[in-house]
């Protein structure tokens, strides 16, 4: 058997459009405060073809939100975000850019909500909002390293609604989901240990 080349492997990919998309992507880092100020952020990603939003509504509990903020303070790894960077043209650097969130809506919404003082974390039994933090602590949230996989889309070569769905499914449903019984069993251990 002859060697298999990268070109040959790419030809086996049945989703030709995804090969095109994958060649127009990159890994970058953002800081929440700059990300929020520099881009139009599309949290819902409306799929015009289907009259439906790609993203579910915000569903995280207060505890989940607080845990994410603590994770940032503690320097724990945060999973990468996935965005589609959409601009009308590759050539115009001064235009408005929209960042569509493909993966990470709950996390990014939580970060923005904390920055807007919409919920507190608990420190020594006291509620602590973003406004209550000193400059260094606020800096930790405003400028934490938000790693992201970014797919680039332009009016002359846009990422289609179908392609957005395929990318979303890749990041959200590609693995084997945990069995409910296994998940409940693990949660039961936590319930026992906190009593």
Question: Which role does the model predict for each range below?
Answer:
Residues 6-7, 18, 54-195:
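Basic- and aromatic-enriched surface patches that contact anionic nucleotides/nucleic acids
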Residues 44-53:
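A short, surface-exposed helix-loop junction/capping segment
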Residues 1-42:
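N-terminal extension/subdomain marker
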